[in-house]
């Protein structure tokens, strides 16, 4: 089963209504589409006018649901919906094994990850970590290295294998590798050279992942139309 499976959600709230003492919002399942997001905005009153004729233009996020350990604690009230959607889509597009790897890395605690930009970059850097399924404690790790990793052979160990303190051996290995144990198995860093493909700029999010307005729409909105009136000529619009 996919890790998210429709369970990455954000409660998008009308900020203007909230400041008036009303909680008007809706749970949004991520990833979603720009069309669906616009429907949500309409339902929660974004774009509509208040009693003074001023439009409700701002929103914020009052709650999250995410099945991946630690993710909710890294997300704030004013996160970009485009970034959130990009993150959810990137996770959904991972293979099932890579999704499980991501879960294990987050459960182990990833020093490189502290915010949504880091989470996005983590999806591009899963090969920087090794996951060893079925190894859940120091004793498992010590036994694996002694018998299965090829460091020692059963023949070489002989009866000495009965006297090995696998737990202590595994503890020393985990300390040397800075590895951690999770429900998914043992997690260790394979490479410290992260490739930061996403620098946090919204312009770097591909249009297909944007849900608050595509790049083309933003470009159209930024165009200024000027009515030019010249003596003896018909007025005309210049962009």
Language model features: what each stretch is:
Residues 136-183, 190:
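Acidic, low-complexity, intrinsically disordered interaction modules
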Residues 103, 109-149:
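Extracytoplasmic/secretory-pathway segments with low complexity and glycosylation-like composition
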Residues 35-116:
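Structured domain cores in non-transmembrane regions
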Residues 47, 90-97, 108, 122-129, ...:
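Surface-exposed polar/charged interaction patches
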Residues 165, 214-239:
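Non-Sec secretion/translocation targeting segments of pathogen effectors
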Residues 1-50:
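N-terminal ordered "arm"
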Residues 171-217:
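Long, highly charged low-complexity segments enriched in Glu/Asp and Lys/Arg with interspersed Ser/Thr
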Residues 13-19, 63-66, 190:
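Short, flexible beta-strand-to-coil junctions
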